[in-house]
């Protein structure tokens, strides 16, 4: 791997494996190396290459301001078969530009964006981590040909044009990485690949689900107070959370759906600035469970109901209060409802410390 890193540093082209296809890399801050890569690929001179990094945190060197959705997708999808085109309004603020000078802007950035890939392959990770300079890469084939999935395919395409080809065996996936462009409205898929549109939506959102029996008392209170707490932390209105990819829901394991929240619950959450007016009870189902990233149940019985519906739900389902149940205030006094709301509110504050939004 040291040889490959040295060759890249010297401006040579090096082929290496990723989890999807074999790539051919070049030093990104060298106009000569980029020109050679474009010639070998037979690529349009105006078409940019994707930057390749050895670790997810390296993206901060190139993208100075990451949106919440961008941070979320980096945390969940990298390393992995996803190339992300980030908007960069001011490349001059990027650490790499401060390090190498403004002349690298035209080499790394294209029309206010930069495409970045963080491969999930040990060879790629080690190679990229050893090179102190920015590295771009593209599939190791000439334009119009199929990307190679093994070293023989690389040599059949590029033998004599590259300084080194590193053999990492056959690639794990048969398809290419997905290419997605992030924007203010979410994302746009530029190339279909291993990561589906459905997976992308999951990567970009956080879904919290609270479960009780009838979805008229405990779980609606939890939903309303959780939504209010997150909105306050985010500096937005509760009904704007969906625009930020944050969804807080509740459901009842024994609910037929359709009913409003109980009067006691509506009144109790007002003490915390939350609003339950307009709540409509929902029945717990597999779709809600599968969509959720975090499921908090009021009792062990509710937790068992979740597991019964989706046996492989894993550790994303937990009791809201670890080790004990939250008693049902249904039919009780206003004091019973307020006591329950206080208990749930305190538990939510602790649980939110565990959740990265």
Predicted regions and their residues:
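Active-site-adjacent structural elements in enzyme catalytic cores
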Residues: 1-211
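A short, structured active-site edge motif that brings together acidic residues
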Residues: 54, 250-254, 320-324
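Short, well-ordered alpha-helix to beta-strand connector turns
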Residues: 162, 292-293
């Amino acid at each position: 791997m040291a040889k490959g890193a040295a060759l890249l540093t010297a401006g040579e082209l090096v082929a290496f494996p990723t989890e999807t296809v074999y790539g051919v890399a070049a030093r990104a801050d060298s106009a000569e190396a980029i020109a050679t890569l474009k010639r070998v690929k037979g690529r349009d001179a105006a078409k940019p290459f994707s930057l390749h990094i050895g670790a997810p945190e390296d993206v901060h060197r190139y993208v100075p301001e990451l949106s919440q959705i961008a941070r979320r997708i980096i945390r969940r999808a990298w390393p992995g078969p996803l190339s992300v085109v980030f908007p960069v309004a001011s490349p001059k603020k990027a650490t790499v530009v401060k390090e190498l000078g403004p002349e690298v802007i035209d080499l790394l950035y294209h029309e206010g964006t930069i495409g970045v890939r963080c491969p999930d392959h040990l060879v790629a990770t080690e190679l990229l981590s050893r090179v102190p300079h920015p590295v771009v890469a593209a599939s190791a084939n000439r334009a119009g040909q199929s990307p190679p999935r093994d070293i023989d395919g690389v040599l059949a395409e590029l033998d004599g044009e590259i300084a080194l080809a590193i053999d990492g065996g056959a690639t794990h996936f048969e398809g290419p990485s997905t290419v997605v462009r992030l924007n203010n409205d979410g994302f746009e898929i530029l190339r279909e690949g291993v990561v589906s549109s459905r997976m992308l939506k999951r990567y970009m959102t956080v879904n919290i689900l609270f479960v009780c029996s009838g979805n008229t008392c405990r779980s609606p209170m939890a939903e309303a107070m959780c939504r209010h707490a997150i909105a306050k932390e985010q500096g937005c209105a509760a009904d704007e959370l969906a625009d930020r990819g944050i969804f807080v829901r509740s459901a009842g394991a024994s609910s037929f759906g359709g009913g409003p929240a109980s009067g006691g619950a509506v009144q109790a959450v007002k003490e915390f600035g939350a609003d339950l007016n307009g709540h409509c009870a929902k029945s717990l189902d597999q779709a809600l469970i599968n969509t959720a990233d975090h499921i908090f149940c009021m009792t062990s019985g509710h937790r068992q109901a979740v597991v019964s519906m989706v046996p492989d739900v894993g550790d994303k389902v937990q009791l809201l209060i670890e080790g004990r149940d939250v008693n049902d205030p249904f039919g009780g006094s206003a004091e019973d409802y307020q006591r329950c709301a206080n208990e749930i509110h305190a538990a939510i504050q602790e649980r939110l410390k565990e959740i990265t939004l």
